[in-house]
């Protein structure tokens, strides 16, 4: 399988920069703490983790979309840009809002619905969003390198699945636009 290196690099850079900066909001608002902080309270590996999660997660989304028979229609660049901005706002809000975990859950769930209908709105996308909302928090729950400081269940706060539900359609649909469509043979166009 051949993946456009430029698309993969864009997704990696987006994750390594944007999501690391957003994660630093969680560090500075004492939403989470790293076991071995390196710079500004974050671990040295955070940009690598965020970059890999965004790039490999985006490619996995494209593969799953194709395998599940998702429709070929792509979101517009404007819709994707708006979804990414709203995702960043929701991520920041999850650390900055001085409210209960339940209120954060409600706000993030509403944000996830807006993002989902902005760039997707399909059954395939709903299944993938649910997969992201389940798998993301599990990955955080088993990562010993940091702790959420107000966990509700399995080392994570109750609003974390809703945050992943915000991120999944925005990054997944961006990846579909950047990576391209798989050919029938399972190969990616390299142009």
Language model: regions and residue ranges:
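Aromatic-rich, lipid-facing transmembrane alpha helices and their immediate juxtamembrane interface loops
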Residues: 1-191
């Amino acid at each position: 399988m051949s993946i456009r290196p430029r698309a993969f690099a864009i997704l990696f850079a987006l994750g390594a920069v944007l999501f690391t900066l957003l994660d630093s909001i969680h560090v500075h608002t004492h939403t989470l703490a790293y076991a071995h902080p390196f710079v500004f309270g974050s671990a040295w590996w955070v940009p690598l983790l965020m970059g890999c999660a965004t790039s490999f997660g985006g490619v996995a989304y494209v593969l799953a979309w194709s395998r599940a028979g998702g429709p070929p229609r792509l979101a517009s660049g404007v819709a994707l840009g708006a979804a990414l901005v709203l995702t960043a706002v929701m991520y920041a809000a999850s650390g900055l809002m001085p409210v209960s975990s339940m209120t954060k859950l409600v706000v993030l769930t509403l944000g996830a619905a807006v993002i989902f209908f902005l760039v997707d709105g399909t059954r395939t996308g709903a299944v993938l969003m649910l997969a992201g909302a389940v798998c993301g928090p599990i990955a955080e729950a088993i990562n010993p390198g940091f702790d959420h400081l107000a966990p509700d269940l399995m080392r994570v706060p109750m609003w974390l699945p809703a945050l992943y539900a915000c991120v999944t359609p925005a990054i997944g649909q961006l990846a579909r636009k950047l990576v391209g469509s798989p050919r029938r043979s399972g190969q990616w166009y390299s142009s």
